Amino acid sequence: MNVAIVGATGYGGIQAVNLLKKNKNYKISFLGGNKTSGLKWNDNFPFIYLDNDPYIEEISVDNISKNADVALLCLPNGLSSTLTRKLLDKGLKVIDLSADYRYKSLDEWKKVYSKEAAIYKRNDDDLCKEAVYGLPEINKEAISKGRLIACPGCYPTSALIPLAPYLSQGIIENEGIVIDSKSGTSGGGREPNQKLLLSECGEGLSAYGLINHRHTSEIEQVASLISGTKIELLFTPHLVPISRGMHSTIYGRLRDPGLTSDDCRILLDNYYRNFKNIKVLPVDTFPSTKWVKNTNQILLSVKVDNRNGRIIILSVIDNLLKGQTGQAIQNLNIMSGFSMDEGLDLTNNFP
């Protein structure tokens, strides 16, 4: 199967090249990047050497579609929407890593991504409704039948997977959910950003986007669908001075305060027992981002505070893999009829 990587020179695109070049089921048919078009790949990315040393090409529908079956859109928010319908009309399947199709309502996207909405005059509410939210562990069947997949954000991935078992079965109350997340600097992308300079963020920890972070509404939308009722929650992201990795600590109120840590661990383990990339750790073993670095694995741990009937769930992912491109490849595998984890590392080279 031929895959076009559109936006190949950002962090998401670079991860896609690295993953697909090792996967016998796929052939990279196009590498797109407007700022670097006309340059040879190996000259710019010698650390991900490609035998045929292809040129990076200008991004256009004709260039993308001439040899591709699937397009991976690794583009900034808003830009993907300028290509998606045209690529679908050409018969390609589309996996979008941006936020353009994560919301079932275009109006909701315009509200949350107002800056992008002012630039990109979209009229594709039908595609927003059609797009499948690409969280493989939750939506595998729908993904297998879809032609447009909207990959989740990194923070939503780290929060929704640990929350889903407890929301879907009514184990926790719908009110009072708090998500405290930490992300490495690569989550900010590859474009220069003063806040991500080593001298600015090194040896420090800071919160950002309190209350109004864009991923809050995305988490709430999907959590509400899982639980069957409207959910509002608190989400606070933090920047930590590591290159990659994400850690989320999630707090909720148990409907049955008599449940123990072992009870909640068994429930979590049973829910994900058929997914090789999800590991539920023993009670009192708490995961580190270092344990999942450069893998598509997600590690989960749960603890109950029986003094107050609260549950604490921990999750760690590599934000560039399970939180981004690794998840896109999971979706590609499902759409193509392959094993979900085909070509994805589930163990890292510790330390």
Swiss-Prot record:
Task: Answer yes or no on keyword Lipid biosynthesis.
Answer: no
Which InterPro entries does its entry note? AGPR_AS, AGPR_type-1, NAD(P)-bd_dom_sf, NAGSA_dehydrogenase, Semialdehyde_DH_NAD-bd
Q: Which reaction does it catalyse?
A: N-acetyl-L-glutamate 5-semialdehyde + phosphate + NADP(+) = N-acetyl-L-glutamyl 5-phosphate + NADPH + H(+)
Q: Where is the active site?
A: C154
Cellular localisation:
Cytoplasm
Q: Which Pfam families match?
A: Semialdhyde_dh, Semialdhyde_dhC_1
MF terms in GO:
N-acetyl-gamma-glutamyl-phosphate reductase activity; NAD binding; NADP+ binding
Which Enzyme Commission number(s) are on file for it?
1.2.1.38
Q: Which GO terms describe its biological process?
A: L-arginine biosynthetic process
Q: In which pathway does it act?
A: Amino-acid biosynthesis; L-arginine biosynthesis; N(2)-acetyl-L-ornithine from L-glutamate: step 3/4
Which UniProt keywords are given for this protein, alphabetically ordered?
Amino-acid biosynthesis, Arginine biosynthesis, Cytoplasm, NADP, Oxidoreductase
- Could you say which enzyme class this protein belongs to? oxidoreductase
Q: Name one GO cellular component term.
A: cytoplasm
Q: What is its main location?
A: cytoplasm
Gene3D superfamilies named among the record's database cross-references: Dihydrodipicolinate Reductase, domain 2, NAD(P)-binding Rossmann-like Domain
- The region annotated as signal peptide is none
Family per similarity comment = Belongs to the NAGSA dehydrogenase family. Type 1 subfamily.
What HAMAP family does the record point to?
ArgC_type1
User: Main role?
Assistant: Catalyzes the NADPH-dependent reduction of N-acetyl-5-glutamyl phosphate to yield N-acetyl-L-glutamate 5-semialdehyde.
Q: What is this protein called?
A: N-acetyl-gamma-glutamyl-phosphate reductase
What does the record give as the organism's lineage? Bacteria, Bacillati, Cyanobacteriota, Cyanophyceae, Synechococcales
Gene responsible for this protein: argC
